[in-house]
Amino acid sequence: MIKKATLLTAFSVTAFSAWAQDTSPDTLVVTANRFQQPRSAVLAPVTIVTRQDIERWQSTSVNDVLRRLPGVDIAQSGGTGQNSSIFIRGTNSSHVLVLIDGVRLNLAGVSGSADLSQFPVSLVQRIEYIRGPRSAIYGSDAIGGVVNIITTRDNPGTELTAGWGSNSYQNYDLSTQQQLGENTRATLIGDYEYTKGFDVVAKGGTGMQAQPDRDGFLSKTLYGALEHTFSDRWSGFVRGYGYDNRTDYDAYYSPGSPLIDTRKLYSQSWDAGLRFNGERIQSQLVSSYSHSKDYNYDPHYGRYDTSATLDEMKQYNVQWTNSVVVGHGNVGAGVDWQKQTTTPGTGYVPEGYDQRNTGVYLTGLQQLGDFTLEAAARSDDNSQFGRHGTWQTSAGWEFIEGYRFIASYGTSYKAPNLGQLYGYYGNPNLNPEKSKQWEGAFEGLTAGVSWRISGYRNDINDMIDYDDHLQKYYNEGKARIKGIEATANFDTGPLTHTVSYDYVDARNAITDTPLPRRSKQMAKYQLDWDVYDFDWGVTYQYLGSRYDSDYSAYPYRTVKMGGVSLWDLTVAYPVTSHLTVRGKIANLFDKDYETVYGYQTAGREYTLSGSYTF
C-alpha cells in the first residue's frame, strides 16, 4: 500500500479526473515504462486484459484474446496450434515484442517473430498491451508495440475447470494458490488441451498434392511459483513453467521424400527475482533461463530421423530495473543482459552460434500542471552488429478538464535473427531494421464515453529482404505505414460497450504495394451484460480485405481476399457460489474466410465448460 499511495501522490492523478472515472486508482501498469504507474498517467495507448476478461470471453487460445484488441490483426494458417503472425498497426510480426513476465519470449530468437499459437492460455493471468515504439525502453523488436503476458496469479484458492467442444476439443485445468505460513504463497497450475482439429487444406503449400486429413493439436502444461515476503520492503520469487505441444499440419510434399507434417515443441522457462519497494525507490533484479526444442518430422520415421529438423535455443537473461520518485514524476534506469545460444542446424544454420546483447536505458516522467512529459533513451551493445541507440519522447496537454492532446515521436529497431545472419542464405553483415514513428492523439470523457482518437505514421528503413538473384538477405526494403485508431468504452444501464476502429495503410515504400496479410480496415465491438445472474457477451469483428500470394500458380500471383464479419456469443451462469457453467458459439453465422491464402478457418464452433472453485 505504501508503494501504491506514493505513486498516486507522485503523479498527481487527481488532475486527470476524467480518466479516474474510467480507470480505477488500483489499475497500475508496469509495461509502459518498466515501473508501476497509474494507467491514466501513461501517454501511449494501452489496453489491459485480466483473467476475468479471458474467462468471460471463453478464449481457448492467446490469439483469440489478442484478436479482440485495437490495432491487432492476426493471420493464422488454420486452427488451434497452427502457425500465426501478429501484426500491430500494420508492422511485421517480427516488429512485435512479446514478453512473458517482462522477459523476452525465447521462441522469437530463431525465427525473429513470436508465434503465440503455442503459448498456453491457461498460464495467462493478465496482458498489458502497449501500442507504438518502445525500443528506447526494451531494445530490439518493439517497433509496432509490446505484449507483456503476466503469469502471476493474485487470487488465492483452487479452481478446477473442464471443457469440451467441436472437433473433439477437450480441456482440463487445475490451478491453485495457497498460503504457506504468513509470508509465503505457492502457486501450481496444470493444464491438458486436445483437439482433433480440421483439414486446413493449405492450397498451394503442399506441392500440388492434397492432404485430406485432420490437423490437430495437443498441449500439456505445468507451472509452479513460490513468492516470499521478507519484510515490508523486500520480497522475492522463484517460478518455472514448461509445455509439451504437438501440432499436425499440411506440409510440402516431394515424391520419394518423407512428408514432414508434424511439429513437436518442448519449452521450459525458469526465473528468480528480488524486489525492493521503498517509499520513493523501487528496484528489482531478475535472472531467467529458458530452453526450447522445436522438432518438425515425419511421424512414420520419428523426430530423430535424419529427415527431421530441430531448432534448439537456450536463452539467458539478467535484468536490473530501478525507479525513483522525483518531483511530480519518476526517473527510471536499468540494465538488460541477454545471451542466446543455438545448436547446429537450428534455423537452417549449419553451426551453433551465440549472440549477446547488453542494453542500458533511462526513462523520465514528469507532470507539470496541465502538462505530462515523458522521455526515454537506450543504448544496446550487440555482439554481432555493435552499438545501436534509440530514443522517444511524448507530451500530453490537458487543455480542458477531462480532455487531453498527446504528441509523440520515437525511434526503434529490429535486430536480424540468427537464420538471416548465419543460415545457408545468411549475411553476417546485415544491419538492424530502423523505424521512425510519429503519433498525435486526442482523448477525453464525453457524456460518460471514454474515447481516444490517434493518427500515426511509421517509416521503416533497412528492412531485411531475401534477394532472389544474389540468394542472400540484404537491407534493401522500406515500409511506410499510416493509420488512424479510434477506441471508446461506455455503459448504458446494464450494458457495457467496448468499441474500436482501425484504418491501416501499410505499404512497401519502394513498390507502393500493400504489405501482405494486413486488413486495411478493422472494426471491433464487445457487448457485455448481466440478466438474472446470466452473464452474456457478444463479440463482433469486421476484418477488411487483405492481399496475399497464391503459390499454387507459377509464377505465384498476388490475390485479394475479401473482408468478413464475425460474431461470437457467450453465456455464463453461476449454478452455485462455487460452480459456474459457460457456453460459447464462435463464428455464429459460420462464415467461410481465410487470413492466410489457401488455409481454411474453423467455421462455426461450440464449447461448453464448467469451473469449480474452493
From Swiss-Prot:
Cross-referenced InterPro entries: B12_transptr_BtuB, Plug_dom, Plug_dom_sf, TonB-dep_rcpt-like, TonB-dep_rcpt_b-brl, TonB_box_CS, TonB_rcpt_b-brl_sf, TonB_rcpt_CS
Chief site of localization: membrane
Domain TBDR beta-barrel: 155-614
Record's keyword annotation contains RNA-binding: no
Name of the protein in question: Vitamin B12 transporter BtuB
Gene for this chain: btuB
Function: Involved in the active translocation of vitamin B12 (cyanocobalamin) across the outer membrane to the periplasmic space. It derives its energy for transport by interacting with the trans-periplasmic membrane protein TonB.
TM helices/strands, residue ranges: 158-165, 169-178, 184-195, 217-227, 232-248, 263-277, 279-296, 309-325, 328-337, 353-369, 371-381, 385-400, 403-417, 434-443, 449-458, 473-490, 494-509, 517-529, 535-550, 558-572, 585-596, 602-614
Annotated binding of Ca(2+) 2, by residue: 213, 215, 249-250, 261
Signal peptide per UniProt: 1-20
UniProt keyword annotations, A-Z: Calcium, Cell outer membrane, Ion transport, Membrane, Metal-binding, Porin, Signal, TonB box, Transmembrane, Transmembrane beta strand, Transport
Topology within the bilayer: Multi-pass membrane protein
Binding site for cyanocob(III)alamin: 85, 92, 110-111, 251, 309, 517, 551
TBDR plug domain ranges (all copies): 38-152
Upper taxonomic lineage: Bacteria, Pseudomonadati, Pseudomonadota, Gammaproteobacteria, Enterobacterales
GO terms (BP aspect): monoatomic ion transport
Family to which the UniProt record says this protein belongs: Belongs to the TonB-dependent receptor family. BtuB (TC 1.B.14.3.1) subfamily.
Motif TonB box, residue numbers: 26-33
Binding of Ca(2+) 1, residues: 199, 211, 213, 215, 250
Pfam family, one: TonB_dep_Rec_b-barrel
Subcellular compartments: Cell outer membrane
Any one GO MF annotation of this record: metal ion binding
Residues spanned by motif TonB C-terminal box: 597-614
Nucleus is among the record's keywords: no
